Amino acid sequence: MNGFTVVIPARMASSRLPGKPLADIAGKPMVVRVAEQAAKSRAARVVVATDHADILAACAAHGVEAVLTREDHASGTDRLAEVAAKLALPDDALVVNVQGDEPLIQPELINRLAELLAGADAPVATLAHALHDAADHFNPNVVKVALDKHGRALYFSRAPIPYARDAYAADRSALPAGLPVYRHIGMYGYRAGFLAAYAGLEPGPLEQYEALEQLRVLWHGYGIAVALADEAPAAGVDTPEDLERVRRLFA
């Protein structure tokens, strides 16, 4: 699958790591490292979407395309919608969202997501991988997704879905054999035309209570195609400790 566009949202504000996109990793800002990884995929174009002039300047200094967006977007998807409009992408263009704090993102995952979206009858696509640890199933910081038999998302939740009623009544320390438990990987692919529609969709109560923006898509009746990845993506950078770990890998 070729010809898709990768958009990397990069905001300067971060509660745990201020100025995160510009954090130095072996002589380059983190957002540039992310863009370099994305460029190893089969994307035709890699664009950073930022709300800060310093990030825009850093991208320009390293030859990375970037666009300046508004600061007041409620979600990353809303920011993508603005970018798709600014780039005048046609409605059938494929847009893959890669987070700006994942300098180790595997290009193969980006390609897999673009391939899924290209062949899907849904306007949104994402990835998941199998969970094998009951502690993760019950962890609200681990987002789970339940799928139908066609590989489309039925629901995303921080709760343990699907819940094995009888098995868990006896023992919650292990996942029952055969229970289809999948962890959502927070990467998305969109058709550009849907992004324009998404910007006008009101948040629903499911999204607000679960704090999961993808539930807005399901709430309004749109489908989300899901492909299973063999492994989780490399860990992103959320804390100073994460940053030091990544710096050691680039040293």
Curated annotation (Swiss-Prot):
Pfam families in UniProt = CTP_transf_3
Biological process per Gene Ontology, one example term: lipopolysaccharide biosynthetic process
Q: What is its EC number?
A: 2.7.7.38
Cellular compartment(s): Cytoplasm
**Keywords carried by this UniProt record:** Cytoplasm, Lipopolysaccharide biosynthesis, Nucleotidyltransferase, Transferase
What cellular component GO annotations does this protein have?
cytosol
What domain of life does the UniProt record list for this protein's source? Bacteria
| Family, as annotated | Belongs to the KdsB family.
What protein does this entry describe? 3-deoxy-manno-octulosonate cytidylyltransferase
Species in which this protein is naturally found: Chromobacterium violaceum (strain ATCC 12472 / DSM 30191 / JCM 1249 / CCUG 213 / NBRC 12614 / NCIMB 9131 / NCTC 9757 / MK)
User: Which classification does the entry list for the species?
Assistant: Bacteria, Pseudomonadati, Pseudomonadota, Betaproteobacteria, Neisseriales
